[in-house]
Amino acid sequence: MNESIDINQIFTLLPHRYPFILVDRVIDYKVMEYLIAIKNVTINENFFTGHFPGNPIMPGVLMLEALAQACAILASLSRQPKEGHEFLHYFAGIDNARFKQVVTPGDQLRLEVRLAGQKRDFWRMHGEAYIGDKLACSADLLSAAKEIKK
């Protein structure tokens, strides 16, 4: 088990910022293998204003984005860029997405991603998001990494 990664360290691994950062903390990972992260869902999320008034539900596409961000963190931890460069991970594909549980304010989404394959700049991972022990969503995700100057 590795040390947890807080939001300040996450900001060094992802380009996302408010209101689109969807990973609050990494609680465990093993490079080139798996990562477990947390997203604390609060009523202050900007998407709850319109999804849905009086019945706030986290959009499924944002659960998938949270998994994609967890995948990008694992890929960033697993591969070092050249000096003065960083990797930007593009969401390149998704298969087998399934939604099993509604996510509402006050829930803590546990994001679990596992590396399924990596070839050059392409990363295939399987992700599952849980609320407690209940599966909220799952998907197979593909990302493409591009090395850019800082």
UniProtKB/Swiss-Prot annotation:
One of its GO terms (biological process) is fatty acid biosynthetic process. GO terms for molecular function: (3R)-hydroxyacyl-[acyl-carrier-protein] dehydratase activity. The active site is at 51. Keywords: Cytoplasm, Lipid A biosynthesis, Lipid biosynthesis, Lipid metabolism, Lyase. It holds the Pfam family FabA. InterPro entries: FabA_FabZ (IPR013114), FabZ (IPR010084), HotDog_dom_sf (IPR029069). It is an enzyme of class 4 (lyase). The keyword Cytoplasm applies. One of its GO terms (cellular component) is cytoplasm. The keyword Protease does not apply. It catalyses: a (3R)-hydroxyacyl-[ACP] = a (2E)-enoyl-[ACP] + H2O. This is 3-hydroxyacyl-[acyl-carrier-protein] dehydratase FabZ. It comes from Legionella pneumophila subsp. pneumophila (strain Philadelphia 1 / ATCC 33152 / DSM 7513).
